[in-house]
UniProtKB/Swiss-Prot annotation:
Family: Belongs to the Maf family. YceF subfamily.
Enzyme Commission number(s) of this protein: 3.6.1.-
Keyword Kinase belongs to the record: no
Protein name: 7-methyl-GTP pyrophosphatase
CDD domains (UniProt xref): Maf (cd00555)
Principal EC category: hydrolase
Organism of origin: Idiomarina loihiensis (strain ATCC BAA-735 / DSM 15497 / L2-TR)
Entry's localization field: Cytoplasm
């Protein structure tokens, strides 16, 4: 019998991905300090935080054992780590700084088997090339989508696609914060496969 699956995230976007994959899961929000360590690269940061989120959920879950998914994401432009904008002004500022540039998103993914006390961590990169945007286009985009809770100030699964001239990476779900191809590969090692009959 496979262990129950828990998503260690409050993100509705990550839940939507798991729903599309026909996975049965519970949600437990982790409560961790997400501060970066000064010498940490973006890849190290998201890997560490994804694992920390998965391990934090173990302390809060109601199951004896489970498979816990932790995930974290940052956007990097010109060597600077970008977070969620939080408000309209910051979103406009972020998007304006991306004009004609490539922004790399790093998504850390952790799958933690609490029974075996084993945690596998992967970091998936994804590049977004922004086209030449006008100030009016940026203002209108922010007005229509309110991307204040999204790293990089856009929702690629919606109108955000109109901001780009190109995408480069293994899995477009990585932009939404949960690389599904890597996740399914990791889950299969724990006996979880949505294509198998129960």
């Amino acid at each position: 019998m496979t262990l129950p699956l828990i998503l260690g995230s409050g993100s509705k976007y990550r839940r939507e991905i798991l729903d599309r994959l026909h996975l049965n899961y519970d949600v437990v929000k982790p409560d961790i300090d997400e501060s970066a360590i000064s010498s940490e690269s973006p890849q190290q940061l998201v890997g560490r935080l994804a694992e920390a989120k998965a391990r934090a959920v173990e302390k809060r879950m109601t199951y004896d054992n489970a498979i816990i998914i932790g995930s974290d994401q940052v956007a990097v432009c010109d060597g600077n780590i970008l977070g969620k904008p939080g408000n309209r002004e910051n979103a406009v500022r972020q998007l304006s700084s991306f004009i004609g540039k490539t922004v790399t998103f790093y998504t850390g993914l952790a799958v933690f088997n609490t029974e075996a006390q084993q945690c596998e961590v992967r970091v998936e990169p994804f590049e977004v090339e922004f086209r030449q945007l006008t100030a009016e286009e940026i203002e209108r985009y922010v007005e229509l989508e309110n991307p204040f809770d999204c790293a990089g100030s856009f929702k690629s699964e919606g109108l955000g696609i109109s901001l780009f001239s190109g995408l480069k990476g293994n899995d477009p779900n990585t932009l939404i914060g949960l690389p599904a191809i890597a996740l399914l590969d990791m889950l299969r090692t724990h006996g979880i496969n949505p294509l198998n009959k129960d």
